[in-house]
Structures are given as structure tokens and as C-alpha cells.
């Protein structure tokens, strides 16, 4: 029997995602819930994009993109929290600040990812969002995208 492309190139796409014009998804990718890809975004095969992510137009996704962030530039980099999307989905200001603090440690403390994960786990109160971010980083197969000022 013949197989369609969907059978050959498995893709998992979550609920309530918005893909603007000319967004392209390679095979074997995973995209979380409430993800927005602006126009002309290309997602490399085997990449994972977490929940509540916004990726700016014209971006090339080569690495995994952790939950709750905005990503842009070339190479694709962390540019902040998707605070507008999170507010629209009912996240409190306190919860958004907690998520921002996690990413400040990850991207601004000059720690490698393993050190940052250990620091966040030891110093920050457990929450579903904290645990989701840490699990995402631990499970990343391609590595997570860098911060804007980090070396690739």
C-alpha cells in the first residue's frame, strides 16, 4: 500500500497552534500547545518546540525551543518570555515573573545548561511551570537555543 507523507514524516502538533503563511515543518518534529509561528518560519527536522512559544517571522529553528518563550534573530535566540500570550491564556503576573526568573538564570547567569538546571532546581520553589521547563531542557535531543548574547 502507498504511504502519504504524513506516514513517512511523523509530526506531533499540539492544540491551539497558529502557523502563519509559509511556515514550514520538517519531519519528526514536536510542537507543543498554544504555539505561534509567524510568517516564513522554518522548523528543522527532529526539533521540539515547547508550549506557549512565539517564534518571530523569518526564523530558522535549528535547536529545541523551551516553553513560554519568544524566539527571534539569526541564529534563533531567546528574546524574552511570551508574556502577551501567557496573559491572554490567564497566567497571573506572579506566574509570568516566576517564569522570567527561571529564564534569567538559564540565559544570563553564565552557567552551562546542566549547572543552570541544578541551580534552578535547588533555588526555586517547585511549580508545574518550573518542572516543565527543567524537564524540557533535560529531554532535549538537539540542545536548546541560545540566549541572544551567548556563544553558539
Residue ranges, per PLM feature:
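Single conserved hydrophobic/aromatic residue that forms the stacking wall/gate
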Residues: 1-9
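Conserved functional loop/turn residues at catalytic and ligand-binding sites
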Residues: 4, 64, 90
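Hydrophobic face of beta-strands forming the core of extended beta-sheets/solenoids
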Residues: 7, 13, 19-21, 25, ...
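Short coil/turn residues that cap or connect secondary-structure elements
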Residues: 9, 27, 45, 90, ...
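Short alpha-helical linear motifs
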Residues: 40, 58, 140-144
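Terminal amphipathic alpha-helical/low-complexity segments used for targeting or macromolecular assembly
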Residues: 68, 74-152
